[in-house]
């Protein structure tokens, strides 16, 4: 395949594959050539704000959440009557721009899971799922844990109610014998679509850290998704963090191979990749509605685990996914949609500890405090999900 055809294929896939795109929508174009070791202060997202914007912008956009919600109390207070809740009778706004891995709420709606619980939902397109929760533009969404944790620590008023699924992203290199593990990436560059300090960056350094690689021995660069394969082939990049869906055809044609994975590696495959996040005020003021919403999504995810092809068809029928159907089914099958609440809580604890040790978040942040403030399954246990 000549270079022109490869570029055309890359561009076509960038347009057609929509899974997990929200992880990188916040990236600023001027950061595209950013390159720095992980220890650089600019990579410390505890000093940044939501989604790579400056602190003043985040404070304005989140209604000064960073100050007002430092001690947010997510304890559910309720009369026990859903009719008494201020949002009762109004649709729950769900931030969803389409995609496979964030599709459970849409499938839940099509299957009538919200309606049978007396709920109505409204799906809204947003530029940033994190900001939509922080500003209460949306009541609920699904987003990557790696992306949500740092801004939540910095003040975004989010409650994590359950895991969405496992897997979805991996570390890729060219399919040759030059690099076969993370050791081979020392003194080289890993690229990703997200900005420096984004979920992609954080995933990369967790892979390296788990393998005993000093994260400062590798450099990191933001590269447009459509240009990453070409950057690997030209030698500009030695490795890349990509969604498994986007990478699949390049694996099939022998261009790249996977050397580290959230989906398939023993030390990551049971972790929740994405999280069902709700606005903290919505949960406090409407605990019964929030619980029913979480229940509907969790029961849908359990159904999806056993009915992958039908679930994928629903996404395609509603224009929430496109591209090659069989590839989409394969990707959906690679996720564990029935990830447990217990494993999701453990994932949050592990991520907090890793981020503290790596300097991604303030070292004073306690995983117990974070769990107490931001993890709330709303009274639902794993045994409740049918």
What positions do the PLM features span?
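C-terminal motif of bacterial Sec signal peptides marking the signal peptidase cleavage site
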Residues: 18-19
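Periplasmic-binding protein-like
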Residues: 164-175, 256-283, 333-335, 368-382
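Short, glycine-/small- and polar/acidic-enriched structural segments
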Residues: 65-222, 238-244, 255-261, 270
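Secondary-structure end/capping motifs
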Residues: 284-362
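Sec-dependent signal peptide recognition
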Residues: 2-10
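N-terminal, intrinsically disordered, polar/charged segments of Gram-positive cell-envelope systems
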Residues: 24-88, 148
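Conserved C-terminal helix/tail region of periplasmic/extracytoplasmic solute-binding proteins
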Residues: 73, 353-386
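Pocket-lining segment of extracytoplasmic ligand-binding domains
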Residues: 146, 221, 226-317
